[in-house]
Amino acid sequence: NNDVTLHPLWLATLIETAERKGADFATGKILQAGNSTLIDGTFDEISRGACAFRCGSGKPDSPFWNQPRRIRIAPMTAALFRRRLFHDIGKLDEHFISYMEDTDFGLRCSIAGRSGVYVPSAVARHMGSATLGAWSSDTVRSIARNQVLLAAKHFQGQPRWPIVAGQLLWGLLAFRHARGFAYLSGKFAGRRAARAMIRPAVGDVDKVGVVVSDSEKEIFEVQRQTGFDIYWSAYAWLVPR
């Protein structure tokens, strides 16, 4: 992103680790530019509710976030990808325009058996939604729209209740921030745009189910280690595993 500042050794650190681990992509610890004691993001996960989770976002930096690990999805805020990955997996899906295109790409990678690494010693600082604003109408509309696209593209044949619960809970957050109209307009826009989406191959349905279930387990493990957010507490109550 153009609102990111990289540590001088960021690139060298990611290249060295990715080469050593044989990873297809790599990302580091991203701190908030305005308060370097808070995490902006680390790695991403996706729930059975078709809602993406940026692990660590808004949490205090702590030893938990200093643990390197294998990851499914790298936030494209600041990440490194092997060129051949785009040849094998495909380019970013331009239907998403902005927001969650990295989630879609990471999910495609994971379905294909590709993975990356989180390297906390590679540090970046991010302004965070500097273009639109974290809860601006445009941001909420874009995310609400793209949640529909993600579900239409990858969640065909998956259990319906987690999707309904996850989307409604996110909508409640939007209403709480006085962005209910933006949320609803985004959902309607998503339904229209989804008609042009390419659906996954039938054989991918089971793979998606496994990947998303494992990813959701990781979300709850992160929540247990760092403290539950209101959204995930409510989601866990509505959608027991």
Label every PLM stretch briefly.
Residues 4-51:
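Conserved donor NDP-sugar-binding/catalytic core segment of glycosyltransferases
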Residues 14, 72-123:
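A short, conserved alpha-helix in the catalytic core of glycosyltransferases
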Residues 39, 48-53, 59-84, 103-105:
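A recurrent flexible, glycine/aromatic-enriched loop bordering the glycosyltransferase active site
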Residues 116-219, 228, 232:
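Active-site-adjacent helix/loop segment of glycosyltransferases
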Residues 231-241:
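A hydrophobic membrane-anchoring alpha-helix module
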